[in-house]
Amino acid sequence: VKGGPIMSKGINSRKVAVIGTGFVGSSSAFALMESGLFTEMVLIDADKNRAEGEALDIAHGLPFARPMKITAGDYDDIVDAAIIVVTAGAGQKPGETRLDLVKKNVAIFQSIIPEIAQRKCEGILLIVANPVDILTQVAVKLSGFPENRVFGSGTTLDSARLKYLLGEHLQVDARSVHAWIIGEHGDSEIVAWSSANVSGVPISEFCEMRGYTEHDEHMEEIAQGVKNSAYKIIEKKKATYYGVAMAVRRICEAIIRDEKSVLPVSSIQHDTYGIEGVTLSMPAIVGKNGIEKQLAIKLNEKEQEALKKSAEALKEVLEDLDI
């Protein structure tokens, strides 16, 4: 990843800003309040009343958590934020794909990102709005920030969904499951089955140990279950937000604590299996400087081809955009 300087002295490492206080933004703000990672949080929304209401509602839970300052503000209030979480954008409607949202949300980003850039913010820009891969690339271009400081939540949630479903299927703690969803956060996403394991035991072997012989069939069902999760939830309750809020919290934790955790975040790829200049998710080391290193995990031929197809699908959308 093309890097920039480490977290600057002008940054308050315990301050976070959340731009957009819809379902995802407010749920993320709540998860961040509970995390104890920050002492200050500012919420920004085009609807100032909404931001003020969410800030008050979340702040009323502080006596049960840790002391911090939660306010609604404007772009001048984010200059010293260590992390700026961007969730603002139109939500996915039933039957709509994430890529269907492109033009609406690119237009929203064309008003938000320059506001951040012109204030010369030195924090990390974490993009959460969908389609996250496209919008992350748009944010890099519009901000002019170094690539290591602008990345998306990517397939962090998809990978968690995969671990959850595998844990349920195999009757094992989901935290012991090590498996990645890579590529687009969307319909062309790929399960990296060839590297999936349960505490070092390859998935296929673990299935047999658990008495599952038809594991190929089960794995395909699980892959489809992950891919269709959001559609299923949106159909039933109009939006998904709790899972992604936990993903946002996890990424922020890795940054603030400089954990150097490996997370499947969305960033511009450089010669990843021949993919160049397209933003998609691959595991990366995440710490206080944002993305420290992208990891080209071992993929079999079929997975490599699927990853290239995912990149092509995203590239076509990018070429259609006027940015």
Language-model regions, residue ranges each:
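Short, Lys/Arg-enriched N-terminal segments with co-localized hydrophobic residues
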Residues: 1-6
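Glycine-rich Rossmann-fold phosphate-binding loop(s) that bind the pyrophosphate
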Residues: 21-22
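N-terminal Rossmann-fold NAD(P) dinucleotide-binding loop
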Residues: 25-26
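Conserved S-adenosyl-L-methionine
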Residues: 34-40, 144-146
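Conserved N-terminal Rossmann-fold NAD(P) cofactor-binding segment
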Residues: 40, 44-82, 96, 315-323
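Rossmann-like NAD(P)-binding element
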Residues: 63-124
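C-terminal substrate-binding/catalytic lobe of Rossmann-fold NAD(P)-dependent dehydrogenases
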Residues: 143-149, 158-323
